[in-house]
């Protein structure tokens, strides 16, 4: 079995800049041009959202994007097809960037666990982040993911106790994902303009109780915030800000152009 692209990525001595994108947002046909634009603009890893009608942990930006994606016919199978086309260079330049799917348990269960993982790997997916799947209840899931060669990422929050941080670190395949605030995504409550002491202390605590790398997301909108998160973590995730930036696009080409311009501004 070939080494997972995410595993290869985290072995590099670099700070990561990770994009979260909802497929076919804001217009049908936007996904492949956006993936190409992000890759050409220096993205390190791409999280693709799996839209769900009741995304409890997501803020209004991602909820709206999910509803629009669903209205454009996006479902698990269509995401696999988009990833397959991206990997084969059909409709865009060949995408070699690691791809992580992020979404809730229900669509995965409805598809069928092993079938989901087999089809994900066949399409070219590298990893999974399932926010509503607690590590304590996911030993079988983790074992099956390992069997299929998928990286699994778990979430850490500011209220996660040290012993649970250590558990999450041990169970995450390559890195953990830290929520910067105890809030829904994209709320913009992350006070990194003044480098909030609580966030700094929280991420220092995570560092003390982890052996693997960890990235931080939620509320990161510009180059200054990316840089400040890089000082405390191994990577920064930008999602809601990217979706907001492309939301007014009327065509796939305009979406890709806006995505590229925004992403270059973060570097």
Curated annotation (Swiss-Prot):
Belongs to the TrpA family. GO terms for molecular function: tryptophan synthase activity. The active site is at residues 47, 58. GO terms for cellular component: cytosol. The keyword Mitochondrion does not apply. PROSITE patterns: TRP_SYNTHASE_ALPHA (PS00167). PANTHER family: TRYPTOPHAN SYNTHASE ALPHA CHAIN, CHLOROPLASTIC (PTHR43406:SF1), TRYPTOPHAN SYNTHASE, ALPHA CHAIN (PTHR43406). It catalyses: (1S,2R)-1-C-(indol-3-yl)glycerol 3-phosphate + L-serine = D-glyceraldehyde 3-phosphate + L-tryptophan + H2O. Pathway: Amino-acid biosynthesis; L-tryptophan biosynthesis; L-tryptophan from chorismate: step 5/5. The alpha subunit is responsible for the aldol cleavage of indoleglycerol phosphate to indole and glyceraldehyde 3-phosphate. This is Tryptophan synthase alpha chain. Tetramer of two alpha and two beta chains. Its EC number is 4.2.1.20. Keywords: Amino-acid biosynthesis, Aromatic amino acid biosynthesis, Lyase, Tryptophan biosynthesis. The keyword Amino-acid biosynthesis applies. Gene3D superfamilies: Aldolase class I. InterPro entries: Aldolase_TIM, RibuloseP-bd_barrel, Trp_synthase_alpha_AS, Trp_synthase_suA.
């Amino acid at each position: 079995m070939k080494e997972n692209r995410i595993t290869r990525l985290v072995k590099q001595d670099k700070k990561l800049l990770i994009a979260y994108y909802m497929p076919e947002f804001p217009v049908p046909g936007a996904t492949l041009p956006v993936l190409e634009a992000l890759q050409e603009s220096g993205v390190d890893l791409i999280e693709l959202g799996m839209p769900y009608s009741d995304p409890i942990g997501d803020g209004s930006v991602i909820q709206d994007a999910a509803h629009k994606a669903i209205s454009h016919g996006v479902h698990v199978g269509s995401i696999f097809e988009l990833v397959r086309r991206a990997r084969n260079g059909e409709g865009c330049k060949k995408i070699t960037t690691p791809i992580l799917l992020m979404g809730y348990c229900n669509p995965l269960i409805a598809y069928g666990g092993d079938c989901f993982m087999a089809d994900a790997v066949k399409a070219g997916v590298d990893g999974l982040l399932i926010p509503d799947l607690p590590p304590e209840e996911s030993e079988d899931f983790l074992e099956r993911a390992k069997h299929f060669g998928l990286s699994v990422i778990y979430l850490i929050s500011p209220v996660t106790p040290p012993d649970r941080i250590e558990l999450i670190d041990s169970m995450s395949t390559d890195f953990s994902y830290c929520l910067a605030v105890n809030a829904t995504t994209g709320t913009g409550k992350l006070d990194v303009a003044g480098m909030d002491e609580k966030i700094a202390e929280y991420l220092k605590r995570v560092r003390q109780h982890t052996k693997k790398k960890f990235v931080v997301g939620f509320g990161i909108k510009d180059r200054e915030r990316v840089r400040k998160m890089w000082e405390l973590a191994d990577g920064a995730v930008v999602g809601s800000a990217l979706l907001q930036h492309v939301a007014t696009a009327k065509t796939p080409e305009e979406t890709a152009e806006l995505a590229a311009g925004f992403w270059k501004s973060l570097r």
